[in-house]
Amino acid sequence: MAAKIIDGKTIAQQVRLEVAEKVKARVAAGKRAPGLAVVLVGANPASQIYVGSKRKACEEVGFVSRSYDLPETTSEAELLALIDELNADAAIDGILVQLPLPAGIDNVKVLERIAPDKDVDGFHPYNVGRLCQRAPRLRPCTPRGIVTLLERYNIDTYGLNAVVIGASNIVGRPMSMELLLAGCTTTVTHRFTKNLRQHVENADLLIVAVGKPGFIPGEWIKEGAIVIDVGINRLENGKVVGDVVFEEAAKRASYITPVPGGVGPMTVATLIQNTLQACVEYHDGEEA
């Protein structure tokens, strides 16, 4: 069986067009365009690329995009003061602080300082807690983007054995909550998991997010499984690959996401969706 490719690039483009239409309709009705503030501290090259793609996506859909590029020497107090300022700014619906932050700045403190109704990354404990309690508002971008992919391909997740590999706060943990909401029997594996292969072989839906190229061999994949590869790994030869050995896995899976062009574009598309949602659900009616 050759797997059907889940085309994240195309779905992400659809999502962006849908958001752009809604923004156009808002502006035509005399409402303001949603605003996103993107904060980058230091000059991490990978972060600069991510931030660039987020800003570009914002402008494409007609958002107001505000950039704050702070020097590596920025103190925690200065960053927290900027967040306070943005929390109070009625023209801003979403605040995104690009991780990782330089040494000496406490990630947790920074993420918790963002007002939950402007936390378009979905990392604030309030938003994670809402997801845990089955009443999500702003949802973490990568997991929500994956759910959107499954929905757009009309994949029925109810009753599937879902296995998440990797238990990070950004993907693995919130993903497990999304899968419970989607009716899956969900297992999360991590570095202490014994007999990983057995878990993978049992997965009807496999989501891999560990950041290690070729970490999951193709022969472990159950026949007919749905494989979602979150990994983005650049090899020394410049090639970008996922956490799953794609060629082998694609022979066994029913659906698979490629790398690049699978989950990656959905993360940014979901950020855009979240910003519009924050604007409409939380901030409409406030004077900008």
UniProtKB/Swiss-Prot annotation:
One Pfam match, by short name? Answer: THF_DHG_CYH
Q: Which GO terms describe its cellular component?
A: cytosol
In its keyword annotation, does this UniProt entry include Amino-acid biosynthesis? yes
The record's catalysed reaction(s) read: (6R)-5,10-methylene-5,6,7,8-tetrahydrofolate + NADP(+) = (6R)-5,10-methenyltetrahydrofolate + NADPH; (6R)-5,10-methenyltetrahydrofolate + H2O = (6R)-10-formyltetrahydrofolate + H(+)
- GO biological process terms held by the UniProt record: L-histidine biosynthetic process; methionine biosynthetic process; purine nucleotide biosynthetic process; tetrahydrofolate interconversion
- EC number(s) reported in the record: 1.5.1.5, 3.5.4.9
Could you tell me the superkingdom of the organism this chain comes from?
Answer: Bacteria
The UniProt keyword set, sorted, is: Amino-acid biosynthesis, Histidine biosynthesis, Hydrolase, Methionine biosynthesis, Multifunctional enzyme, NADP, One-carbon metabolism, Oxidoreductase, Purine biosynthesis
Its pathway is: One-carbon metabolism; tetrahydrofolate interconversion
| Chain sites annotated for binding NADP(+) | 166-168, 232
List the GO molecular function terms: methenyltetrahydrofolate cyclohydrolase activity; methylenetetrahydrofolate dehydrogenase (NADP+) activity
How it assembles, according to the record, is: Homodimer.
Main function: Catalyzes the oxidation of 5,10-methylenetetrahydrofolate to 5,10-methenyltetrahydrofolate and then the hydrolysis of 5,10-methenyltetrahydrofolate to 10-formyltetrahydrofolate.
- Family to which the UniProt record says this protein belongs: Belongs to the tetrahydrofolate dehydrogenase/cyclohydrolase family.
**Full protein name:** Bifunctional protein FolD
| Species per Swiss-Prot/TrEMBL record | Cronobacter sakazakii (strain ATCC BAA-894) (Enterobacter sakazakii)
The organism's taxonomy opens as: Bacteria, Pseudomonadati, Pseudomonadota, Gammaproteobacteria, Enterobacterales
